[in-house]
Amino acid sequence: MVVKAVCVINGDAKGTVFFEQESSETPVKVSGEVCGLAKGLHGFHVHEFGDNTNGCMSSGPHFNPYGKEHGAPVDENRHLGDLGNIEATGDCPTKVSITDSKITLFGADSIIGRTVVVHADADDLGKGGHELSKSTGNAGARIGCGVIGIAKV
């Protein structure tokens, strides 16, 4: 059974991101567009809570149900919400195209109801040596976010 979800991002960065997963055993395809980004890399993560009552700050930390360190999307040791970076050319829109085998739209670890956050700076993928590298990827301010909601198939 295919599951689809959508996230409307608001803030200084704005856009729409779509999620699709064919079954609980297949990767999630993430696609969409974001505007309002400076040229360069921007951290792109799923955060724990679907709470935007205090803007992006109330979305909590990266979604990390297994207590792992921050890492790159290809790392075994990573938060489930670590989706790496999206690259802005300076023109609007910035395309989002990610396939990830760790996140899911099924079961207890589903990202539906959680928040996508776009960050001001590049995610160092846990390898930057900064005090925040192993928790946030030192990706800077939260400049756009939105709650992931279930979408019509």
UniProtKB/Swiss-Prot annotation:
One of its GO terms (cellular component) is peroxisome. It catalyses: 2 superoxide + 2 H(+) = H2O2 + O2. The keyword Phosphoprotein does not apply. SUPFAM superfamilies: Cu,Zn superoxide dismutase-like (SSF49329). Keywords: Antioxidant, Copper, Cytoplasm, Disulfide bond, Metal-binding, Oxidoreductase, Zinc. Zn(2+) binds at H62, H70, H79, D82. Cu cation binds at H45, H47, H62, H119. One of its GO terms (molecular function) is superoxide dismutase activity. Its EC number is 1.15.1.1. Signal peptide: none annotated. Its main location: cytoplasm. The keyword Disulfide bond applies. It is found in: Cytoplasm. Gene3D superfamilies: Superoxide dismutase, copper/zinc binding domain (2.60.40.200). Homodimer. This is Superoxide dismutase [Cu-Zn]. The gene is Sod1.
